[in-house]
């Protein structure tokens, strides 16, 4: 135990070590220490002290050696790790290099036509370096691993050669291997060149126009491909075989690796346990060495001496009796005998444990490797063998059926592939048609888009033009309506002037007829006047007809407008127009009533005039001059009215020029132009008549010098007065008409607002129409697309019909095959019936055999139960016997020890004195107070679970080393289950 070394003694000396020892431990090594032995009485004591110092020095040297061994061990572990990493890297390089060589070999086998399989395998063996003899420990370990697994031979052989050879040999071997790899790559390049040449030759032959060369090339290519196919098949077989072997080897190696890992884990645990035991033993040895040194120093310091006889206490010395020393020696011998017995018992137990472990391992191996003969002799194996034979025959039959089914399946596959090819062709053709149709549709769509863009641009232009022409048209309509109203007013005035002219002409004719008997000049004038009135009467007929014509035209235009307005306007506006028309009709009726009243007044005035004429005849002479003045005034008034008419005519011309410059699109403009032309003609006729009347008046004024002329002048003056009255009435009517014009202007403004609303409605309708047109175009496009889809679906339906017909034919063929298969199934069912009968017979036999087997199994289970019971009883009896033997031995030892004590107590002359008795008691008490685990320290800790007392250090070490059980009763304890106690 002392040769194992002690770490703690060198680094951490015990608390009871003296300072002299500490100095010696610190200075041990290079310096030579002087040792003080103290007072020595004899040579024996000197030898003892020198031996003690030598022992101490040797212990220190052992500690140093142990530290050096630990450092060297760590260095060795580092080197081993480094060597393992180097070996692993070399293994990886070698493995990938071998894989590279293997790939090159497979490529050469794949493409090299002249190379055989045997040559290839020989080449593979040539690439492997031969295995050298192991020289080092690492190589020896690798050899052991190679003996375990044969799959790792090439890699480890290469590493073994590298480990056993020198640097020059390593370089030469690596150069050889590199050269071999380079040669293999060069072979691949040459092989590729050959293949390229062959391909070029064949392509040249095939591309040449000569049929014979092409046939030769095809035959050569066919033979080459068939040969290549055979080679590839052979290569695939070899590779499959190799893969199978490698997979088996891999599984074996994996199992070995698992077992090795489990063994390594077990060994690691064993190493940890042994290391812990070694540390424990070293600590114990250190404690004993310290204790021994302390005892020796105490003995030397206090001066204990041994004398041969007597036991008396001298000053500073204690005498020990020789008898006591002999007793101690006897006890020591007894303890040695007990220790020997214990060692023998431990060796027997260890031997038994080894035998049990070997038997256990043998049984495990036997369980893993069951005997084949024993298995074959079992009835279960025989039943399974018979079932296997039956199943094997059935499998052969099923294999035959499977071959037939495969042939059928191959036929159906070929037919299916043909059908698929036909369908694909149809699909390709349909795709082409669809693409062409899509292209056409895209072209048409592009054209339609262009047309749509053109129409949109035109529509925008027309909208812009309409927006620009809208206000102009409104202004023109406003002007036209105002001019129409003005023309109507002028027409009314013209009619009034015509009436006045007619009345004046009628009055003049009456005057001329009355004054015809007086003078010849008056006769001639009366004749002229008699001839003129019919002309004058005839002339107004023309303008009345002319006036009636524009009235009819204007009525027609108003009716057309009313119809349009009635169609466009809403019901509310129609009601308003109706109300306005009713008001206009009421105004017309009022005008008619006024005209009737005026005619009545005229009749009354004519009667009054006739009465006045009688009176005026008497007064004509006196008033002739006054009449001339009045006629001149009337003529002036007529001339002023003529000027006004001419001015209005000029305004009408300007308006006509404006109308002519405006676009002639509406009917209202045409009607206005026609009305204007008629009004111009009427004005020219009126001017001519006015001129004729002036000439006639001048002639009459020259002729009328007599009394008749004076009378006529008076009558004319009266007529002028009457006309002035009428003129006042006309002015009143004109004012009424102006008020009516204001009313009509307001109505016209209302109409304009209505027209604006109608224009907005028209725009909205145009927008709606535009939207409807775009929707219609879209719907037409969708309709076209739907038509095309319909045609495509019709084509698809036709193709599907053809496919259905083809599938119906296939179904018919399959039905025929089904009939054949049903017939074969019928025959098979008959055979199956026969076989089922045979199987039922075999089942009955098997049932009988199974019943017998069950009976035998029950008997065997009963026997096995009895055997297990007997074995358990034997084991229990053996255990009890061993316990009894152990207790018997312990009892014998106790009896012998107690017998010795009794003998010592019985001897009277051996009776010790009081001091010895006290010393024995003190020893007994000290033994009771010392810890039973270490036998060194005092008891100062208690376990609260079982209340056994030990030293605190032992309990703490047990807790730290996870041996958390009581040394006496094996009761488990935790961190809070022990604490210190103090015994006085």
From Swiss-Prot:
Sequence ranges of Basic and acidic residues compositional bias: 139-150, 527-540, 558-632
SUPFAM superfamilies: RING/U-box
PROSITE patterns named among the record's database cross-references: ZF_RING_1, ZF_RING_2
A biological process term (GO) from this entry: chromatin organization
Coiled-coil portions: 43-90, 236-378, 429-907
Enzyme's top EC category: transferase
Superkingdom: Eukaryota
Zn finger region (RING-type): 931-970
UniProt cross-references to InterPro entries, sorted A to Z: E3_ubiquit_lig_Bre1, Znf_C3HC4_RING-type, Znf_RING, Znf_RING/FYVE/PHD, Znf_RING_CS
Alphabetical list of Gene3D superfamilies matching this protein: Zinc/RING finger domain, C3HC4 (zinc finger)
Chain spans, region Disordered: 1-34, 128-150, 506-632
Gene Ontology terms for molecular function: ubiquitin protein ligase activity; zinc ion binding
EC number: 2.3.2.27
Pathway(s) of this molecule: Protein modification; protein ubiquitination
Keywords assigned: Chromatin regulator, Coiled coil, Metal-binding, Nucleus, Transferase, Ubl conjugation pathway, Zinc, Zinc-finger
Record's function text: Component of the RNF20/40 E3 ubiquitin-protein ligase complex that mediates monoubiquitination of 'Lys-120' of histone H2B (H2BK120ub1). H2BK120ub1 gives a specific tag for epigenetic transcriptional activation and is also prerequisite for histone H3 'Lys-4' and 'Lys-79' methylation (H3K4me and H3K79me, respectively).
Summary of subunit composition and partner proteins: Component of the RNF20/40 complex (also known as BRE1 complex).
Protein name from the UniProt record: E3 ubiquitin-protein ligase BRE1A
Phylogenetic lineage: Eukaryota, Metazoa, Chordata, Craniata, Vertebrata
Gene, per the UniProt record: RNF20
């Amino acid at each position: 135990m002392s040769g194992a070394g002690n770490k703690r003694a060198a680094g951490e000396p015990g608390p009871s070590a003296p300072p002299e020892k500490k100095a010696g431990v610190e200075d041990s090594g290079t310096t030579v220490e002087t040792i003080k032995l103290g007072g020595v009485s004899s040579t024996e004591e000197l030898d003892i002290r020198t031996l003690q110092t030598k022992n101490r020095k040797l212990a220190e040297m052992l500690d140093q050696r142990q530290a050096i061994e630990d450092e060297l061990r760590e260095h060795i572990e580092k080197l081993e790790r480094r060597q393992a990493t180097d070996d692993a890297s070399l293994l990886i390089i070698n493995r990938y290099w071998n894989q590279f060589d293997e790939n090159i070999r497979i490529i050469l086998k794949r493409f090299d036509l002249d190379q055989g399989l045997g040559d290839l395998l020989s080449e593979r063996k040539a690439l492997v370096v031969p295995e050298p003899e192991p020289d080092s420990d690492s190589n020896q370990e690798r050899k052991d691993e190679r003996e375990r697994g044969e799959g790792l031979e090439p890699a480890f052989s290469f590493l073994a050669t590298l480990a056993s050879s020198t640097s020059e040999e390593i370089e030469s071997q690596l150069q050889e291997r590199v050269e071999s790899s380079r040669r293999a790559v060069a072979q691949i390049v040459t092989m590729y060149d050959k293949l390229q040449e062959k391909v070029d030759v064949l392509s040249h032959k095939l591309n040449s126009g000569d049929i014979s060369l092409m046939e030769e090339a095809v035959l050569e290519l066919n033979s080459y491909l068939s040969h290549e196919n055979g080679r590839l098949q052979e290569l695939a077989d070899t590779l499959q075989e190799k893969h199978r072997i490698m997979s088996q080897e891999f599984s074996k190696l994996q199992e070995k690796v698992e077992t090795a890992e489990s063994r390594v884990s077990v060994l690691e645990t064993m190493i940890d346990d042994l290391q812990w035991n070694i540390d424990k033993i070293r600590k114990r040895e250190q404690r004993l060495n310290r204790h021994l040194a302390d005892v020796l120093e105490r003995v030397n310091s206090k001066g204990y001496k041994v004398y041969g006889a007597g036991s008396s206490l001298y000053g500073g010395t204690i005498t020990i009796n020789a008898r006591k020393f002999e007793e101690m020696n006897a006890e020591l011998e007894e303890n040695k005998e007990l220790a020997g017995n214990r060692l023998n018992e431990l060796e027997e137990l260890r031997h038994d444990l080894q035998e049990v472990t070997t038997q256990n391992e043998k049984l495990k191996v036997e369980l893993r490797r069951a005997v084949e003969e024993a298995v074959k002799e079992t009835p279960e194996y025989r039943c399974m063998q018979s079932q296997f034979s039956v199943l094997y025959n059935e499998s052969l039959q099923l294999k035959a059926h499977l071959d037939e089914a495969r042939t059928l399946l191959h036929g159906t596959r070929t037919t299916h592939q043909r059908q698929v090819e036909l369908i694909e062709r149809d699909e390709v053709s349909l795709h082409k048609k669809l693409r062409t149709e899509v292209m056409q549709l895209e072209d048409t769509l592009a054209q339609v888009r262009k047309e749509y863009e053109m129409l949109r641009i035109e529509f925008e232009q027309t909208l812009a033009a309409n927006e620009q022409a809208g206000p102009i048209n409104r202004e023109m309509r406003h002007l036209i309506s105002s001019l129409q109203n003005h023309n109507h007013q002028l027409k009314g005035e013209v009619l009034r002037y015509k009436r006045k002219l007619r009345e004046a002409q009628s009055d003049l004719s009456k005057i001329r007829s009355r004054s015809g008997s007086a003078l010849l000049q008056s006769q001639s004038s009366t004749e002229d006047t008699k001839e003129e009135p019919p002309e004058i009467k005839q002339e107004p007929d023309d303008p009345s007809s002319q006036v009636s014509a524009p009235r009819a035209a204007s009525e027609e235009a108003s009716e057309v407008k009313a119809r349009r307005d009635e169609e466009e306007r809403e019901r509310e506006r129609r009601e308003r127009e109706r109300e306005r028309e009713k008001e206009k009709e009421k105004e017309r009726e009022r005008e008619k009533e006024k005209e009737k009243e005026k005619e009545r007044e005229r009749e009354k005035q004519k009667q009054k005039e006739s009465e006045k004429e009688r009176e005026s005849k008497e007064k004509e002479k006196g008033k002739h001059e006054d009449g001339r003045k009045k006629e001149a005034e009337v003529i002036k008034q007529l001339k002023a009215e003529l000027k006004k008419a001419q001015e209005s005519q000029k305004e009408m011309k300007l308006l006509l020029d404006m109308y002519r410059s405006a676009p002639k699109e509406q009917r209202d403009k045409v009607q206005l132009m026609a009305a204007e032309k008629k009004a111009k003609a009427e004005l020219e006729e009126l001017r001519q008549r006015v001129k004729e009347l002036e000439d006639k008046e001048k002639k009459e004024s020259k002729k009328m010098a007599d009394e008749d002329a004076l009378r006529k002048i008076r009558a004319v003056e009266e007529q002028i007065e009457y006309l002035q009255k009428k003129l006042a009435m006309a002015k009143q009517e004109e004012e009424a008409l102006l008020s009516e014009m204001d009313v009509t202007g307001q109505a016209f403004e209302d109409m304009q607002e209505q027209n604006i609303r109608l224009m907005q409605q028209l725009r909205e309708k145009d927008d709606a129409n535009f939207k409807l047109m775009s929707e219609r175009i879209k719907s037409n496009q969708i309709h076209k697309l739907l038509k095309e889809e319909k045609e495509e679906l019709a084509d698809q339906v036709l193709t599907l019909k053809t496919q259905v017909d083809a599938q119906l034919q296939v179904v018919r063929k399959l039905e025929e095959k089904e009939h054949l298969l049903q017939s074969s199934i019928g025959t098979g069912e008959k055979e199956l019936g026969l076989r089922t009968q045979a199987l039922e017979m075999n089942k009955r036999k098997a049932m009988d055999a199974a019943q017998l087997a069950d009976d035998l199994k029950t008997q065997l289970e009963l026997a096995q139960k009895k055997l297990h019971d007997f074995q358990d009883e034997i084991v229990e009896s053996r255990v009890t016997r061993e316990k009894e033997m152990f207790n018997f031995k312990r009892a014998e030892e106790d009896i012998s020890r107690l017998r010795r004590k009794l003998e010592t107590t019985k001897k009277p002359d051996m009776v010790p004195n009081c001091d010895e008795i006290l010393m024995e008691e003190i020893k007994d008490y000290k033994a009771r107070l010392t810890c039973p685990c270490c036998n060194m320290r005092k008891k100062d800790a208690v376990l609260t679970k079982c209340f056994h007392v030990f030293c605190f250090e032992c309990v703490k070490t047990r807790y730290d080393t996870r041996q958390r059980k009581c040394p006496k009763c094996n009761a488990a304890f935790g961190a809070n289950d022990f604490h210190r106690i103090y015994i006085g």
